[in-house]
Amino acid sequence: MVSVNKGEWDRSKGVEADYLFHQTWIAACNRKLRPGGTIWISGTYHSIYQCGYALQVEGMHVLNDIAWFKPNASPNLSCRMFTASHETLLWARTSKKDKHVFNYEAMKYGDFPKDIMKKPEKQMRSVWHIPLTKKSEKAFGRHPTQKPEALLERVVLASTNPGDLILDPFMGSGTTGVAALRHGRRFIGIEMDEAYLEGIARPRLQAELDLFRDIPATGQKPNTEAQLWHEIDGIMKAGK
């Protein structure tokens, strides 16, 4: 077991610079959200508290903090602290007064057979038992912080409706896009690392689109008009 070098983008530039970065991109996302639109942010203790504070400074209303429990998390290398076995997901809407989408019945009555925390026909709780990314989901290459499709599919199904537009400003390997396309949502992804964009995310999303072409007509046309790539002026660079 060795530590993972996640790249320059994952290195702290100091508390103040890190917070300014998070505040900047969260404010940029908030400007693009319609009233009642929501944002999901995932992270560990290294950054999630700064993000939570930035959401509140921006005037957004935090709906939930989700604990994603990883039953197969990697062991702690130093043996001097507890093994990190969860990440936090923050879910917030544009303001306290706005109405947001929450597909309550899909979460209560949906089928989540591998989540031992979810009891059949009971309300979905804020602790999610989801294993790390499957090997099959890394067929196009490895990304150091790739999230499992099951996690992003749950996020998409819980808080959006078919045809909604989802933006991921840190697309990485494209998992958010896969979840969006798979469930009939539109998608815009931004990724500053060309190796991940061209080597993993683009072919992975194209493969997901190709699946639609192999499905016989059922009277309900799948969403093949998803906007995969979008040029946005002034895309933020890490640390600016």
Name each region found by the language model.
Residues 1-199, 240:
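Core catalytic lobe of class I
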Residues 202-239:
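S-adenosyl-L-methionine
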